[in-house]
């Protein structure tokens, strides 16, 4: 009676064995195909610009996790190579201005700066021969520095000099700033905090006073204030302590910003800190009087 079952077991064993290896082979094949697809999409994604600039920034991470391949333009100008070494000292005063002039314009408009405009800014009043010699020498020096740091090129295209960075390898705070600022109406608290972190290093190129830079500085100051105030007035702003930080930051750019004062006083009041709110108002009206030589036209109760 036990004979037939044994025969069944004996005959079914190789079937199960081959089926097992068939499924294993299919699993490996699916895994390889899936891995290849993920890798392809990842590489493709890195080279296709997103339609939503704020999606390019991860809100749960700091803007720069290390100084490797990093350029800071907010606060003091600093540039770090791939090993995190500060190479700012390699730039002489003229090379620094040349680099910053090309960098700011390249990041801002993607084209760089027209050659004749570059000559006019840096070597105005010199003979054509002198300009040509100075440009040639300093461009060669700049190229030499850039060749040592990789993933950055000095190019001339259609009469424009420009710097081209591979942002997969480089962090440039001004580039990240522009990504954020383009979507100012859509920013949530996480992205506002990224902008806050970025700008906390200081005003844009704060220790540099080139005449050509004034326009950029004014534009950035106005944009930062506008973005923070737009957010502070939006329905997304519900953290009074963060609103106080925003107001204080705006005061760094405009110490008599009425909007910042109102935001700060109301946020302090909502936290039950009424005496601090009144003190903030008193400081504001004192500064207002000193700057405009007239009294502010509202009292504390009107703005709360």
For the regions a protein language model found, what residue spans apply to each?
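Short, low-complexity patches enriched in S/T/P/G
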Residues: 11-23
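Intrinsically disordered, low-complexity protein-interaction/activation regions
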Residues: 21-263, 269-304
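Membrane-proximal extracellular "stem/stalk" segments
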Residues: 1-14
């Amino acid at each position: 009676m036990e004979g037939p079952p044994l025969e069944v077991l004996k005959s079914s064993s190789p079937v199960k064995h081959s089926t097992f290896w068939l499924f294993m082979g299919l699993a490996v094949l699916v895994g390889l195909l899936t891995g290849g697809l993920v890798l392809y999409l990842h590489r493709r994604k890195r080279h296709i610009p997103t339609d939503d600039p704020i999606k390019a920034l991860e809100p749960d991470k700091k803007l720069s996790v290390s100084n490797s391949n990093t350029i800071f333009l907010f606060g003091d100008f600093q540039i770090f190579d791939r090993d995190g070494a500060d190479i700012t000292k390699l730039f002489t005063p003229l090379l620094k201005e040349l680099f910053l002039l090309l960098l700011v314009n390249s990041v801002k408009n993607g084209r760089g700066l027209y050659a004749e405009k570059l000559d006019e800014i840096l070597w105005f009043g010199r003979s054509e021969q002198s300009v040509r010699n100075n440009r040639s020498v300093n461009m060669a020096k700049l190229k030499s520095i850039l060749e040592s740091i990789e993933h950055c090129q000095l190019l001339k295209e259609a009469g424009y000099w420009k710097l081209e960075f591979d942002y997969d390898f480089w962090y440039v705070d001004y580039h990240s700033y522009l990504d954020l600022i383009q979507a100012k109406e859509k920013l949530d608290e996480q992205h506002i905090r990224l902008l806050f972190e970025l700008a906390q290093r200081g005003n844009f190129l704060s220790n540099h006073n080139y005449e050509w830079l004034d326009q950029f500085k004014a534009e950035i100051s106005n944009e930062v204030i506008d973005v923070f105030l737009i957010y502070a007035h939006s329905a997304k702003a519900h953290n009074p302590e963060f609103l106080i930080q925003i107001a204080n930051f705006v005061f760094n750019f405009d110490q008599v910003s009425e909007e910042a004062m109102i935001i700060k006083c109301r946020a302090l009041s909502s936290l039950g800190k009424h005496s601090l709110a009144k003190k903030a108002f008193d400081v504001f009206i004192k500064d207002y009087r000193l700057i405009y030589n007239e009294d502010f036209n509202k009292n504390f109760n009107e703005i709360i």
